[in-house]
Amino acid sequence: MEEHSVGPLVPAVVKPEPSKNFSTDTTAAGTFLLVPTMSDLDKDFLCPICMQIIKDAFLTACGHSFCYMCIITHLRNKSDCPCCGHYLTNSNLFPNFLLDKLLKKTSDRQISKTASPVEHFRQAVQKGCEVTMKELDTLLLLLTEKKRKMEQEEAERNMQILLDFLHCLRKQKVDELKEVQTDLQFIKEDIGAVEKHRMDLYRARDRYSVKLRMLDDSGGRKSRHSSMDLNSSGLASSPLNLRGGLSSGSHTKKNDGKSQISSHGHGIQRRDPITGSDSQYINQSGLALVRKKRVHTQFNDLQECYLQKRRQAADKPHGQQERDTNFISREGYSCGLDDFQSVLTTFTRYSRLRVIAEIRHGDIFHSANIVSSIEFDRDDDLFATAGVSRRIKVFDFSAVVNEPTDAHCPVVEMTTRSKLSCLSWNKYAKNQIASSDYEGIVTVWTMTTRKSLMEYEEHEKRAWSVDFSRTDPSMLVSGSDDCKVKVWCTNQEASVLNIDMKANICCVKYNPGSGNYIAVGSADHHIHYYDLRNISRPVHVFTGHKKAVSYVKFLSNDELASASTDSTLRLWDVKQNLPVRTFRGHANEKNFVGLTVRSEYIACGSETNEVFVYHKEISKPLTWHRFGTLDMEDAEDEAGSYFISAVCWKSDRPTILTANSQGTIKVLVLAA
């Protein structure tokens, strides 16, 4: 995707004005000296060229004095006096010794005014000031004592700094030790709780196995007794009924045989799930090994997740802890452990994405193939696609999955004037779908007539995103490159609200729990969270992305996921206005690659032509799937040419619709 944002100007740093009384001069040694200026000295002491105190004064034939280097440099370019313009050459320059002496004395006086007593003493000694041996001894004693005191103070300061450092280090390590000890206590308690729960499960399994064996044994005895009774009654029958009795007896024996076989077979069938056959045991053992391997692969992230949840549970208010105590006594688990078990279960449940259906671009698309948006309808029965082909195509999901063909025909198809960027189904009116296009037009379509119900043309540039409200089916919101967010109502032609964002709008999304709140992602790298009842300023601006925010999606009323062209996803808490987690693993630097959320899972595309799935509690990918191509010529350039362009979860199961820039659509499902 292209960024058109104009970044904020960096404020200019205002430099402080130099002092009017002194100017700074840097010596060769790099020290700064205070040099007197015109307020302290007569202007005649200043060189007319450099406007500083004259150094190595030279006099011209016309009577003006300059620094030697200043006048020599001037005469290399011009042959006149800088003051009066009189003709002048190097032969007309003469050293001005008197002025040099006067300037030197003036400079010495200025230095003496600002010099320290030590500097005065040093200058006096250098000038040959006579000092007696006794005076020198006294001075040496004073200097020695002064040096000793300074060394003592320096040593004390160093010791104090070292001691402060060691105290800080000790405090830090003690805090870390306390934290580790607390964590170890959490782990010890949780190990005990898990072991107890596991033993309870084993005992329950054993009790159930014994009960099944008892039922099987009693069933076998009953069948044998009934068989003996029937046989004895047949033998005691009259001769007239002997044939019938025999036939009846033989029939009964046959039925009993079937019953015994059936009962025996049924008994095996019921025992297998409990005792387990060898193949089942091997499969279960292999699955356990795979899950353990996945745990070790993401051990650091899982460890962080566990400790975070346990610490949060321990830091809860007293009233909340009492409720958690009731939970612990009832379930045997702490609240934090229960939360982590849920994370661990959902994280290790799946390890790959499996393709269950595919629609080839060559059969349903033509010259333009990029699928910009793919969305399920309210009941997940239908899904719609749109993109640069200027068509909205609606497919029957069950037909796509169950019919073994790559070329599926849409059940509804609508043609548009412009390329499409986004789709949004109405969550109440099943036959309504909204679209945004490259001309900035937002259109509401009806499936029954296959025509537009409303067209909104207020956007001045390309509209990137549109979204229906989940709580009010008549409201929808859109965002555009014209830097405006517009709220629409299907009952009126003009926009209801207009928010000027001062930056290109890439995505908009309603909060699923309230029609008053929207999240807006823009090219200024930020997410603006607005309350539509007061649009003068956002409720909060979430910062952290380094480039434009291309997608925003709500996992819940309080959790917001965002995608950016900085190759990261981020999770935010819109209730506490805090960042929660950053996800890395996919590549996304310029294109819209799609973002979709479902319960604990977040999925997005990548510019490597791969689909990535993340668990919301783990910052690294859960799994990923690479789109392949059947064309060998395309296979070489696939990694650099194609990218995932749209993704969408099915709400009732771990199934995801994916599409790429080649126009290929795949139905993927999370598998173990």
Curated annotation (Swiss-Prot):
One of its GO terms (molecular function) is zinc ion binding. This is E3 ubiquitin-protein ligase COP1. E3 ubiquitin-protein ligase that acts as a repressor of photomorphogenesis and as an activator of etiolation in darkness. E3 ubiquitin ligases accept ubiquitin from an E2 ubiquitin-conjugating enzyme in the form of a thioester and then directly transfers the ubiquitin to targeted substrates. Represses photomorphogenesis in darkness by mediating ubiquitination and subsequent proteasomal degradation of light-induced transcription factors. Light stimuli abrogate the repression of photomorphogenesis, possibly due to its localization to the cytoplasm. GO terms for cellular component: cytoplasm; nucleus. It is found in: Nucleus; Cytoplasm. Pathway: Protein modification; protein ubiquitination. Keywords: Coiled coil, Cytoplasm, Metal-binding, Nucleus, Phytochrome signaling pathway, Repeat, Transferase, Ubl conjugation pathway, WD repeat, Zinc, Zinc-finger.
